[in-house]
């Protein structure tokens, strides 16, 4: 397109924005119009004109200079863009605002050359135009915008303007440099002081000297411009903290001269080609420190924010706008990848297993986190490193927070299951080698929990110290609880064993009490106590403390004395004492020293034996009613078993330490009255005086009855038939006796009967035979009574019928009335109380 042809809708003189879908690849787009409005559709233009996914692979070039000095022409010739240029005949402003175009190719000395990176060129409205007159506000803002957003700022001046102040735009540049120093100075100072900082961003001021005749060497012109710029920089009003910053900290200078475009067209074209050659060469003009280090989509946002800050005159540090761009883009990436992660998280952890393979869970955690961070890195790593790392940490925290929800559930289940298993294994020890094996179990449980927590803690991302500390505390509490239970079991078993052994000894001693009975019982009791203490020798093998061991021995002593007390009152009661008195009385009263039954011949012998037996029986009553030793001293325990405080502390109901037991205190309260009653009696008191009086009364009643019974038997023995009477009967009945003996039938019957009795006796069947005989006799008597009852019923019809039955005169064919009467008569045959009628009895006898 020639300079004389109109640009139609793509003309840079148009103040309205051009839609992206109507722009050709060579056309430009207006970034900022003359009304200072920023075009938000720049990114769409770049995406259509530049190669896809250029990322950081781009450069921004801007041009600055007076109006109608050929800025647009230079850009079009050098970068092959299509910016509107001035009409030779009108000499008026053509570029309004700021325009942007993508350079398809570069003009070089060898024709057209392509740069390795995409080049975007900004054509800035010229300064000192008659259209704006003295209004330099837009000029300053446009210059500052170009300086802030570009890598290379082309200062387009004529050779005749070198050395001038206003003509070379030195006044405008001074204002721009002051604002630039104010805005960029703080970050530049920080990066300069921070030796580790990689931020050393600069802007290349490429001074293009136009219409160079050649009389003055370019080096001299460059020296003049350099001196003027540095002098101007030194004259800037710098804040105190920024005075040490030099011109070189912000800018690099480079120079290139071009001949007159019209008078020397070939030389002009050759000069443009030489400049293009430098642009093609890597790291010649486009050096890494000039790049803004943000991707192209971030640069568009950065440019928009820069213009917003410049337009509103907000005194902010513009490099933070780069950070804002990075923050905005990185936040977008974070939201995207975290949303994908959340969806996958819901699918994987919709249902959480109670006992999973924690190593697999930990690997799944790591894979999920690595995947989401890799997705973030692929997109966000091209932005500002500090922001990228900051947002990466934010994403890391979000992922950790989400995964920690699952971690907390797994950790809770792990601790609960581990505690349950540990408690079960601990109980299964049943006290065997408890100290060593419980230590081994606790170490094993802690090691396993620590290992599993490390698997799912994302390499320490989730704190496990508190969980491990709590688990260790719970293990210690369970161990202490089981130690207490095992300790109480040992004490309880020892008390039970003592009680069983002591019970047998006491029963043996109390069967035949003597003055030494309680001495022997107490001695054996102490021996059983010593057996327990010597067996454990101050330690129970449970790894318990010395205080706990002492408390266990004290509990054993208390409970053993309490068991002793309970045994005394179990084995010695009113009924048992009365029974023993009766037994001892019977042993003396009914049997002699050889154990044979006594047969008393007279009352005197009976009375003497009765007195001796009674004295023998009552002799043990003092021994059984109070626990006294042979020295007449009562048995007193080493510990007061009747004190309420000790009974609550050492009682059997407290043997398990009240762990998770309800109602323990209420049970103790219910037994308070009983404890009061026990405390009133004392240990040695077994049977009080009231009970003793009851025993004596019952005993006297029983022995008096036995005395009277025995005395009656003596009287019967005295009044019985004399023995000589039997001799007289034998002599007088001798003939009859011999007649029976001589009769073969009776003699044989007697022999058979005697032999049968002998056989039954030898086979121990005599008693069963007598029982059978007795039942047979009873049955015969019952049948006889029944027959007699039938005869004695007071009814002549029934009597006649019964008599006919007895004589066999009842005929088969009988009248229906007689049959009915017989049915009625059967009701009277049922057993019922009936008085015997003497008249009917006489009738029966007469018949």
UniProtKB/Swiss-Prot annotation:
Cellular component aspect of the GO annotation: cortical endoplasmic reticulum; endoplasmic reticulum membrane
EC number: 3.6.5.-
Pfam families in the cross-refs: RHD3_GTPase, Sey1_3HB
SS bond partners: none
Membrane topology recorded in Swiss-Prot or TrEMBL: Multi-pass membrane protein
Location of this chain's protein in the cell: Endoplasmic reticulum membrane
Superkingdom to which the source organism belongs: Eukaryota
Transmembrane annotation, as ranges: 721-741, 745-765
Stretches assigned to the GB1/RHD3-type G domain: 55-290
One Gene Ontology term of the molecular function aspect: GTPase activity
Cell membrane is among the record's keywords: no
Keywords: Endoplasmic reticulum, GTP-binding, Hydrolase, Membrane, Nucleotide-binding, Transmembrane, Transmembrane helix
Family: Belongs to the TRAFAC class dynamin-like GTPase superfamily. GB1/RHD3 GTPase family. RHD3 subfamily.
Name of the protein described by the UniProt record: Protein SEY1
């Amino acid at each position: 397109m020639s300079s004389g042809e109109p640009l139609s809708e793509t003309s840079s003189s148009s103040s309205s924005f051009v839609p992206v879908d109507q722009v050709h690849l060579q056309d430009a787009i207006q970034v900022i119009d003359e009304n200072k409005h920023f075009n938000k559709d720049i990114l769409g233009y770049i995406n259509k004109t530049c190669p896809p996914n250029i990322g950081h692979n781009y450069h921004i070039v801007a041009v600055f200079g007076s109006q109608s000095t050929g800025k647009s022409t230079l850009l079009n010739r050098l970068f092959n863009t299509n910016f509107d240029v001035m009409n030779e005949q009108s000499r008026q402003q053509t570029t309004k605002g700021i325009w942007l175009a993508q350079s398809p190719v570069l003009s070089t000395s060898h024709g057209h050359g392509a740069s390795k990176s995409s080049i975007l060129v900004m054509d800035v409205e010229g300064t000192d135009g008659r259209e704006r007159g003295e209004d330099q506000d837009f000029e300053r803002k446009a210059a500052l915008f170009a300086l802030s957003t570009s890598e290379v700022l082309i200062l387009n001046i004529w050779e005749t303007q070198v050395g001038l102040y206003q003509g070379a735009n030195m006044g405008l540049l001074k204002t721009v440099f002051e604002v630039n120093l104010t805005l960029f100075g703080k970050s530049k100072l920080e990066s300069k002081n921070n030796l580790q900082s990689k931020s050393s961003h600069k802007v290349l001021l490429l001074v293009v000297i136009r219409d160079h005749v050649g009389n003055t060497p370019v080096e001299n012109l460059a020296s003049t411009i350099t001196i003027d710029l540095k002098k101007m920089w030194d004259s800037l009003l710098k804040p105190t903290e920024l005075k040490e910053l030099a011109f070189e900290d912000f800018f690099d200078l480079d120079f290139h001269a071009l001949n007159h475009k019209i008078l020397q067209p070939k030389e002009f074209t050759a000069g443009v080609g030489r400049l293009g050659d430098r642009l093609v060469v890597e790291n010649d003009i486009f050096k890494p420190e000039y790049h803004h280090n943000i991707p192209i989509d971030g640069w568009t946002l950065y440019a928009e924010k820069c213009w917003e800050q410049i337009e509103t005159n907000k005194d902010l540090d513009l490099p933070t706008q780069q950070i804002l761009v990075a923050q905005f883009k990185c936040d977008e990436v974070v939201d995207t990848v975290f949303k994908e992660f959340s969806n996958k998280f819901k699918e994987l952890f919709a249902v959480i297993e109670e006992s999973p393979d924690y190593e697999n869970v930990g690997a799944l955690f790591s894979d999920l986190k690595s995947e989401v961070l890799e997705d973030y890195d692929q997109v966000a790593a091209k932005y500002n490193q500090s922001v990228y790392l900051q947002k990466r940490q934010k994403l890391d925290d979000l992922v950790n927070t989400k995964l920690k929800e699952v971690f907390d559930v797994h950790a809770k289940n792990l601790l609960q299951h581990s505690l349950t298993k540990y408690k079960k294994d601990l109980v299964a020890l049943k006290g065997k080698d408890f100290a060593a094996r419980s230590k081994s179990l606790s170490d094993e449980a802690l090691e396993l929990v620590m290992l599993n927590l490390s698997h799912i803690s994302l390499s320490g991302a989730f704190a496990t110290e508190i969980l491990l500390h709590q688990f260790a505390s719970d293990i210690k509490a369970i161990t202490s609880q089981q130690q207490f239970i095992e300790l109480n079991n040992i004490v309880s078993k020892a008390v039970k064993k003592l009680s069983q052994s002591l019970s047998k000894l006491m029963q043996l001693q109390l069967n035949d009490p003597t003055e030494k009975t309680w001495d022997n019982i107490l001695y054996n009791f102490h021996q059983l106590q010593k057996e327990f203490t010597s067996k454990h020798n101050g330690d129970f093998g449970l790894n318990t403390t010395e205080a706990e061991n002492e408390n266990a021995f004290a509990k054993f002593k208390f409970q053993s004395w309490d068991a002793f007390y309970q045994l005394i009152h179990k084995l010695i009661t009113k009924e048992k004492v009365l029974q023993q008195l009766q037994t001892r009385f019977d042993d003396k009263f009914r049997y002699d020293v050889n154990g044979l039954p006594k047969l008393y011949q007279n009352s005197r012998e009976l009375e003497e034996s009765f007195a001796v037996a009674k004295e023998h029986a009552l002799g043990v009553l003092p021994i059984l009613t109070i626990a006294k030793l042979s020295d007449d001293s009562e048995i007193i325990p080493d510990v007061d078993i009747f004190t309420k405080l000790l009974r609550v502390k050492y009682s059997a109901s407290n043997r398990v330490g009240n762990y998770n037991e309800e109602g323990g205190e209420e049970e103790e309260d219910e037994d308070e009255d009983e404890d009061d009653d026990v405390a009133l009696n004392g240990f040695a008191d077994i049977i009080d005086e009231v009970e003793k009086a009851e025993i004596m009364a019952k005993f006297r009643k029983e022995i008096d009855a036995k005395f009277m019974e025995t005395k009656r038997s003596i009287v019967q023995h005295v009044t019985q038939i004399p023995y000589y009477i039997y001799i007289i009967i034998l002599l007088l009945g001798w003939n009859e006796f011999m007649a029976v003996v001589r009769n073969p039938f009776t003699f044989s019957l007697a022999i058979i009967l005697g032999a049968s009795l002998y056989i039954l006796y030898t086979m121990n069947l005599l008693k069963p035979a007598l029982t059978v005989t007795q039942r047979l006799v009873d049955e015969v008597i019952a049948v006889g009574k029944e027959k007699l009852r039938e005869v004695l019923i007071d009814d002549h019809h029934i009597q006649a019928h019964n008599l006919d039955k007895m004589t066999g005169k009842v005929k088969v064919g009988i009248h229906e009335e007689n049959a009915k009467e017989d049915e009625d008569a059967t009701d009277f045959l049922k057993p019922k109380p009936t008085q015997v009628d003497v008249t009917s009895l006489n009738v029966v006898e007469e018949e």
